[in-house]
């Protein structure tokens, strides 16, 4: 893809990608290297372009429909450790400034009403302290229990919070209410947030929840504008991720690959023209 609509400002080894060679994403990092740790571990960091997320090119302003921001989260990692090789590391005295600059730059290169998907692990630094570095309030976050340290948080440029801002948040009590949205909504939204009800809630077709979810997700894509973002979050962690992927009309860009640990599925999609990619090509586990 000549002009990818999604920018990953610090791709690392692309751990949360469903396709590590996704042409929809311009993957950047400050380093390009291959490290062998011990006898059996090899870490590849091979971005499309080398950039520092604290200072992105000036001519990228308002260029991207979505930004992925998964910065290093360790402040204590050995110089030759596997953790530093795979995830990188922040300086314990300057991490606030580093993340603040990263947030500002990520939002700067977003188009109006674009979204930034931020991923964080609280191994060393609490999420609350990290969010204090952001210049805007988050739009939403994937709730996780105390046993999970990983969080997905979504920011919208220009503080989009309402339908007039191109935002649609859908949390229906009955899935059937979501399978046939108003026709006039077609192509109206830049961002759709979809959180289906639990399978124990009324309204699901007995024994056919995948059909219901397929119809609902198709409606989500229908009401999106081209290059619009779909945020899918669902508490049904007992449902295998593979089963959900069979219901999606397009391949996800990134997501929570281990929902049983976080007790919630989180997937990020973007509406694009059909790229001819079959399901078997992108279900990479």
Located regions from the model:
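Class I S-adenosyl-L-methionine-dependent methyltransferase catalytic core
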Residues: 1-285
